[in-house]
Each structure stands twice: as structure tokens, then as C-alpha cells.
């Protein structure tokens, strides 16, 4: 059985560099899932999207969302946030914070320069998700030390060994 994370643990987990999967609702009620970069700060998830993107349109119509963030390698962990999203104007510095988070200082600066024209043409908004309920899973206690050492070795060794 996975253990539950404390609030401090899941907030630290969300602050790590992982890609989220945002679920919004289509007009017919069908879930629409989208991998998306985010920043977690001040108790909320902040994401950027186009003004008229499917995500933004879905949230304007029905603000209920789910966001799942996971570790894709053992020991598996995940945080699923249930809440309501708001569509807010562009926030100063948020693009830079997200780009740096995922691409580093140099890569983030390059990304911002190359994406600026597309961003300006589409118009950008911020999706803000404030957690109403959080579900966590942490399988770390179930991964024995030998298994953890093997996983570490696999990451360090060339593929195929």
C-alpha cells in the first residue's frame, strides 16, 4: 500500500521539476487531458496557455479541473489536485519562471526569445488552480534498498547494460 504524503511533502513534490497533466471538461463532459508545464507557489498551480486554447475555453465554461503530477520512475509517487481553475490575465514574470524551471537559465532565455512572437500573436492567459482536495501516493516505503540501488545504477549506466 502506498503511504500518503503530508502537506509539506506534497508541496515539496509539486515544487519539483515534473510535467503536470491537466484535465478539463469538454462541452459534452468528456475529460480533455493535456501535459503542461506549471509553477507551484503560494498554494496554487500556475500554468500558461493561449487565450482561446481548448484548455482556456473549457475552464471558462466549467472551472472544475484535475491536475496529476507523477514520478514516472520507481519509487512511484504522485499528487493529484482537484479544484477549480480561474483564467487570469498574463502575470508578470510567470513565463520566465516556467521557462527557467524546465529549461534552466540559458535554455529558458532562448525559449522565451524564440517563442515571444507566437505568444504575442495568440495572446496568453494564466490558469490558476487552487487545490480543494489533494490525493497523494508514495510507494517509496515499498521499494527495498536493493531495488533503489539497482534503479540508481540503471540511471547511471549506459542503455542496454
Regions found by a protein language model. Give the residues of each.
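Alpha-helix boundary recognition
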Residues: 14-15, 60-61, 120
Amino acid at each position: 500500500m502506498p503511504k500518503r504524503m503530508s502537506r509539506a511533502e506534497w508541496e515539496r513534490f509539486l515544487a519539483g521539476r515534473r510535467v503536470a497533466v491537466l484535465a478539463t471538461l469538454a462541452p459534452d463532459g468528456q475529460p480533455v487531458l493535456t501535459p503542461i508545464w506549471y509553477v507551484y507557489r503560494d498554494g496554487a498551480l500556475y500554468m500558461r496557455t493561449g487565450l482561446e486554447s481548448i484548455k482556456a475555453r473549457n475552464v471558462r465554461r466549467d472551472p472544475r479541473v484535475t491536475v496529476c503530477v507523477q514520478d514516472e520512475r520507481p519509487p512511484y509517487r504522485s499528487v493529484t489536485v482537484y479544484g477549480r481553475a480561474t483564467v487570469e490575465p498574463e502575470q508578470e514574470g510567470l513565463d520566465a519562471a516556467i521557462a527557467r524551471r524546465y529549461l534552466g537559465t540559458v535554455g529558458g532565455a532562448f525559449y522565451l526569445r524564440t517563442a515571444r512572437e507566437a505568444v504575442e500573436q495568440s495572446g496568453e492567459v494564466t490558469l490558476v488552480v487552487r487545490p480543494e482536495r489533494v490525493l497523494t501516493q508514495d510507494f517509496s516505503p515499498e521499494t527495498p534498498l536493493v531495488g533503489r540501488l539497482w534503479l540508481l545504477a540503471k540511471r547511471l549506466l549506459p542503455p542496454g547494460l
